[in-house]
């Protein structure tokens, strides 16, 4: 079973850069999007054999998530059930027969760490949400989690130490999630591989491969034996992020 996750940094813009062709080529069972930056009705995107679910931010042109699936879910939920967090279109959960699929666009702590305090609250509440699901069925979480966990996960760790996405506080929250019974699938399979999933549009960062790995598939520990592969598709353009992939043995 193939899962794809991609922060498209504006789906309408990405569609103009070949999104539909990439979608079809990747031939996923589940294709999750973050940062769609859309409202309902702005783009009529349908793919044969797929059903789609969308969560839009209240604020226009901001945030937003979507999931395309070939498999009919038992139920779908939007957000995490906490009003403070549920106006930015950041989370969609599909309940399947044997697992929950959660896609997430984690709030960025922003320049000057203006949203770091909010981010810390989000991290704790979102982790509790995942743990509540995990009590019922294994969880597959994917998305732009807006943190490079370890120094290997970004090109310039020393100069970014207190920047959004690589603060000690954000990294500690990710460690806490993993210690709660989850695994970072790519790093589990490839403990020493240096590969990034996001590059700034500035300073020719992508050409220089001065990137960050902030897009993840994180699963419940008990799915470890079913993980066949995890990939980061650095060759695919169309956004400042590239797609990441998880293959699970049924």
Q: Where are the language model's segments positioned?
A:
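Conserved beta strand-loop-helix elements of the APE1-like EEP
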Residues: 60-75, 193, 204-225
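N-terminal, active-site-proximal structural segment of metallo-dependent hydrolase catalytic domains
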Residues: 1-47, 57-63
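Surface-exposed cleft-lining segments at the edges of enzyme active sites
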Residues: 81-82, 107-123, 158-162
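Active-site beta-strand/loop signature of hydrolases that rely on acidic residues for catalysis
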Residues: 7, 23-41, 101, 130-151, ...
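Structured beta-strand-rich core segments of catalytic domains in phosphoester-bond hydrolases
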Residues: 37, 42-109
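Metal-dependent phosphoesterases centered on the DNase I-like endonuclease/exonuclease/phosphatase
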Residues: 51, 122-210, 214
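Active-site-proximal beta-strand elements of phosphoester/diester hydrolases
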Residues: 1-9, 98-110, 142
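Active-site beta-strand termini and strand-to-loop segments that position acidic
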Residues: 70, 94-97, 220-221, 239, ...
